[in-house]
From Swiss-Prot:
Alphabetical GO biological process terms: argininosuccinate metabolic process; L-arginine biosynthetic process; urea cycle
Residues noted as binding ATP in the record, renumbered to the chain: A9, F10, S11, G12, G13, L14, D15, T16, S17, A35, G117
High-level lineage: Bacteria, Pseudomonadati, Pseudomonadota, Gammaproteobacteria, Lysobacterales
Protein location: Cytoplasm
Amino acids binding L-aspartate: T119, N123, D124
Protein's recorded name: Argininosuccinate synthase
Binding site for L-citrulline: Y88, S93, N123, R127, Y273
One of the Pfam families matching this protein, by short name: Arginosuc_synth
Amino acid sequence: MSKKNIVLAFSGGLDTSFCIPYLKEQGYAVHTVFADTGGVNEEERDFIEKRAAELGVASHLTVDGGPAIWDGFVKQLVWTGETYQGQYPLLVSDRYLIVDAVLQRADALGTCAVAHGCTGMGNDQVRFDLAIKAQGNYTIIAPIREIQKEHTQTRLYEQKYLEERGFGVRAKQKNYTINENLLGITLSGGEIDKWEAPGEGARGWCAPRSAWPADPLTVAIKFVEGEAVAVDGKPLSGPQILMKLNKLFASYGVGRGIYTGDTVIGLKGRIVYEAPGLTALLTAHRALEDAVLTKQQNRFKPHIARKWVELVYEGFFHDPLKTDLETFLKSSQANVNGEIVLETRGGRVDAVAVRSPHILTSKGVTYAQTADWGIEEAEGFIKLFGMSSTLYAQVNRSLRS
């Protein structure tokens, strides 16, 4: 009797390593997919492939997730110009692209059974499950959630489970839970979870202040219809742009912060995050929009943007409302063309120059300096513009007297 195929989102870590023998003992032929979204080097990719083979998978597939994460998430996030709760730039949104890779593999194998290694306490389980459910009638198996029903020390249980079956466990145990991809890095655990100051080890790409270069960094980013297409005059693919900006701005400590916010399941979450490239892109794009969008566009767009960010954070990546909002966002980018010059001396980044044919200026007019209208026109505008407030004050003064 042939075993039923199941496709597992695999990272090579303890949780997903445990999932393979666990699922095999449930009667499945396990096929693993590793979606490389930019968080590993070639050596780590090789380790993941060998680890899957060691654990006895039926097949293993590595997928380049860089183009998908740019086209499916980064472009739209930059269009919004927003972060979750005004701070966090949605750095684990690669989960949705990982799901896509898993489902494509499942469809190719003709199976509806898929699995992931998410725990039952975090946000990722929500993102994985909702993204899967939105795309078809798939059966979701979550082994870590299953064992958490019976075991409180789940990681110790997983280690023992693997060792009893002859599989080694990496001797080096990390002090922090680290998520790394093209978007950036998040760190949690240890003193971070205890609401204390992060230790020196709680650092990813971003250099500490003592290591910042003495000379300032200046970088020019070109946008076409809201999408970054070149850095310092050199055309690059989206993933290449983000990788380059990550490297440049990380050396100046740009994009690092401590975030405390509301998780999907209602708990408070606290992480250290680093997103140097995204921070640079968002800063540049916002400066260009400020110059080329109308007053009403710049006023209204943040309402749409905040809702889009909330939907993505909370797992509604495939909700029709998200698609509707993206239609508006894409339309708003028609004139977001030009080049922004960014500058950093460390820690923060500023847009210091804007170059675009779409800047909303008028010949002969400079704010607070020169104008092509008369004094009487200005006075008339002020009178009409403030009519409601002026009448309110007049009426209430007369009533009080």
